[in-house]
Amino acid sequence: MLIIAVGIMYLQSRYIRHSDYGYDKSVVLVGNLPYELLDRRETFVSELSGLSGVEGVSISQFILNSSDSYMNWGRGQGENNIYFACFPVDYRYLSVLGIKITEGRDFKAGDGDVYIFNEAARKKYPWMKVDEPATPGDYPVVGFCENIRFSSFRNNDAVEPMAFFIYGKNHADWDANNILNIRVDPGVDKVDMLHRLAEVTEKMAPGSDFRFRFMDEVIDQNYHQELRFTRQILLFSLIAIVLSMIGVFGLTLFESEYRRKEIGIRKIMGSSTGEILYMFTKRYFVMLVVCFVLAVPFGWWIGHDWLESFSDKTPIRAWVFVASFLLVSLITVLTVTFQCWKNANENPVRSIKTE
């Protein structure tokens, strides 16, 4: 039961880590922009961009996929009312993260108070056009981008409208909540890169509180509770497996000793070691099948209930149940074989005399 649940949780964890997010999260570092550098952020960006191995630097108000929700904006009235998640960025952001434009253009230097919506927004609000206001009297739309994973898997971002937005010309209207996004070469030494970034930051803002992390770390942190629960279930599964092995070992020990004379007679009558082992294994295999049939609904229920916390989730695959059964079967067969091997190979005359 627990092994099945762990298998389902593993599927979702793997789905989270290996899904297409729509941007290059594995090569992007994120960190806070020190308050002391707010007025010199462009100079700071230039310093960081000049480091060997850095392919681009941008600024945003949030970290993608670090939360279940961000700013939610409502614009327009009546039939032209729109509601979407807003993600303030600078003009370099989409190119730094590798987010693809599907129509229109990317942001450029000098832009201010303009949107780039995702395809989900265009599908939900089909009247939105490039180079036109999102709604009458609102800011203009300069482009559309592919749907990306902008919040956690607890939401279905494939159907949720969102927009990247630049606050004021050259993001002049931003407050202090700014995040650095640094794209690095995939082959760069990560430890060395973090050290060099820290050196530049310390040089420009001595004593400031800063920390750079790869986006993968941030995403894992967003699922801390789910991953912790998975590890707990895995631990209980290992304990259950060990206890089961001890139980099977004890039963096999008792039965093999109890039937020692029978084993000797069977050996004299021509039974092979393999046939003796099969006699014991078959009995436990039947018990295993019965237990597995009873455990499947409970394992499915635990895994399915855990998946309910995710809006975007992987389907429960049949191979999880097959793999769980094969794993338990292998453990059982090895345990029975290990314990019965000695008695199955013992001199039958000696075992009969002993009895």
Segments (PLM) and residue ranges:
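Membrane-interface junction motifs in transport/secretion proteins
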Residues: 18-41
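Membrane-helix entry/capping segments
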Residues: 194, 203-239, 258, 303-328
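C-terminal membrane-exit region of the final transmembrane helix in multipass inner-membrane proteins
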Residues: 13, 258, 324-355
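Intracellular coupling helices
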Residues: 246-287, 345-354
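Hydrophobic alpha-helical transmembrane segments of multi-pass inner-membrane transport and secretion
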Residues: 1-10, 227-261, 289-290, 294, ...
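Juxtamembrane/transmembrane-helix interface segments of polytopic membrane transporters
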Residues: 7-10, 282, 287, 295, ...
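Alpha-helical transmembrane segments
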Residues: 1-26, 306-311
